[in-house]
């Protein structure tokens, strides 16, 4: 009559279509189903037809229908004969409990700080449910109530004095740790009585059979301290409880907002392909015998593409999560190191205090023994100002000295500890600030690096002349100023060296002239007469042109005269002085002397037009005249 397999059956064809039964019911539930059917009223006028419950639905191979099948099974199994026994218009109490508004606030929820244990009893009364599903708080409390109140309803219905049993109901409070990047929660349950804790641990030691992947954590001292405590016998977990909890878990209204984002839209799209229809108007040009195969190929292709995109997004999210985890680990390691150093310092202080106390105790015993044996004068030398003190006064004096020393040491160590604490706090605050600004700094550094790399070639002097003339002038002026300062320093240094070298020579010449003044005077007169007799032959212009002139080898004074001449010629042509043209012309003259005349004229024609040739000729004539 009904399918008895616990898993959905699939029959996959060669075309990529699988046939899935929409529900599956274990054979153990046949009796429940028959009991439900026995309460149904069979109308006599309606024609009876056999129900074809063995139905297979075609779905794509890539589509996972296990969740839908599980939900259908849960809805079927949670039906009870109470629906008929309480009447058509009256719902049972447990169903009314399940219809609580999900927007209500939980009544038993406490802040995590208030649930922290302060003694051994409270520690034993706390159990933890790890990897709890991501439900809203009211749904979490509803699940906990179903678990903890297991068996109480049957006891209340089975006995007349239900009020007394309700008063003895298991009382508890709960809290949770809500992680920032993980959907699963950690639930803390604090019972009011230790016997309830033992009952809960004994009943739900395999809680993962009810709540998948949930781990029950409790104190290991429960077995030691509560082994003699008698509790109510544990109740076996019924299918009804499992189905009630499944209904809560599978109800989308009970789910909290997920923290893992990035591919929910793809999940919805893949789920929508279960009822995806291709419009036949889009396939009007396709032969009828090929339409079914093409529709299957379209659905399979879209599903495959969505699966690939979902995997890629999931990989990206995992990479980002791993980076965040590494940052947090680095931060926690720094905090742990600081905490370990602080604990080590506290242990050292405690050891030193214990040693001081032991030494004080030994010294006190030594003095007491010496006074008892009337040998205090031999074993201890009393300070002169305290020789007249009796035993009580001396003990008070020693105690005051010890306390003063301890206070002094304490203040010194306290100040040192505060200094270290402040330095460590500052370092951690800077580290936190750096981590908070990590994303912003990464983008800023990337932009700065890209801009620097992009402008690397354009920032050279060779390109600044054409691309950014003002910047070129600034750099040239700065460079020229630096060169002039270096030249002045070199001139002063050379002048000082020459003066130091000439001073002894001048002294020698003065001595020599004082001895040979008359012969030198006659010789000077003879040379003057001889020079007047000589006739100077001027050099022809052709001979001057044939001379090889090297500008770099000219003296600094002549080079300055050339620069002044260039400046005057540029001012005559343009009307204003131009430092750029001065540097360009002088550099060309230094590098090529008179060989680069044509290249210099071509370069100056951009600024001076026809005056470029005239300026170059006048400049060359001036340089020849200096040589």
Swiss-Prot record:
Signal sequence coordinates: none
Cross-referenced Pfam families: PWI
Protein family (similarity comment): Belongs to the SNU71 family.
Organism of provenance: Lodderomyces elongisporus (strain ATCC 11503 / CBS 2605 / JCM 1781 / NBRC 1676 / NRRL YB-4239) (Yeast)
Protein name (record): U1 small nuclear ribonucleoprotein component SNU71
Keyword Hydrolase part of the UniProt annotation: no
Domain of life assignment: Eukaryota
GO-annotated cellular components: cytoplasm; spliceosomal complex
Subunit and partners: Component of the U1 snRNP particle, a subcomplex of the spliceosome.
Residue runs in coiled coils: 300-442, 469-513
Subcellular localization: Cytoplasm; Nucleus
Keywords: Coiled coil, Cytoplasm, mRNA processing, mRNA splicing, Nucleus, Ribonucleoprotein, RNA-binding, Spliceosome
Region (Disordered): 337-368
Transmembrane intervals: none
Record-annotated disulphide pairs: none
GO terms under biological process: mRNA processing; RNA splicing
Described function: Component of the U1 snRNP particle, which recognizes and binds the 5'-splice site of pre-mRNA. Together with other non-snRNP factors, U1 snRNP forms the spliceosomal commitment complex, that targets pre-mRNA to the splicing pathway.
Residue spans of biased composition, Basic and acidic residues class: 337-350, 359-368
GO molecular function: RNA binding
